[in-house]
Amino acid sequence: MDSNTVTSFQDILQRMSKMQLESSSVDLNGMITQFERLKIYRDSLGESVMRMGDLHSLQSRNATWREELSQKFEEIRWLIAECRNILTKTENSFEQITFLQALQLLLEVESEIRTFSFQLI
């Protein structure tokens, strides 16, 4: 995994955990949890591409893998929509910077997951 991506995830998660949004902390905690799960999924998918044995095992459970991949893309789209929603509402520059960076990171991760998945298909 790219060390910049690791740093970006850690930085954004740390900053989000310190925020209090007007909507609710439950929404923010849900976003943080989904970011963490997305990072783990992206890491495991990248590692699967690197190991040919895992490639064979993924192909053998192809239908399940495709469903899981589809679900992750839905989660990414939801997170992107939430980041955009927060950006339209907030006037706090710290929150704006954090969620702009989160949005950029989500787009990068979506692209990486697409690349990995094409390599596995």
From Swiss-Prot:
InterPro entries: Flu_NS2. Keywords: Host nucleus, Host-virus interaction, Transport, Virion. SUPFAM superfamilies: Nonstructural protein ns2, Nep, M1-binding domain. HAMAP family: INFV_NEP. Belongs to the influenza viruses NEP family. It comes from Influenza A virus (strain A/Mallard/Alberta/88/1976 H3N8). It comes from the Viruses. GO terms for cellular component: host cell nucleus; virion component. The keyword Repeat does not apply. Mediates the nuclear export of encapsidated genomic RNAs (ribonucleoproteins, RNPs). Acts as an adapter between viral RNPs complexes and the nuclear export machinery of the cell. Possesses no intrinsic RNA-binding activity, but includes a C-terminal M1-binding domain. This domain is believed to allow recognition of RNPs bound to the protein M1. Interacts with protein M1. May interact with host nucleoporin RAB/HRB and exportin XPO1/CRM1. One of its GO terms (biological process) is exit of virus from host cell nucleus through nuclear pore. Average number present in a viral particle is estimated to be 130-200 molecules. This is Nuclear export protein. It is found in: Virion; Host nucleus. The keyword Electron transport does not apply. A motif (Nuclear export signal) lies at residues 12-21, 85-94.
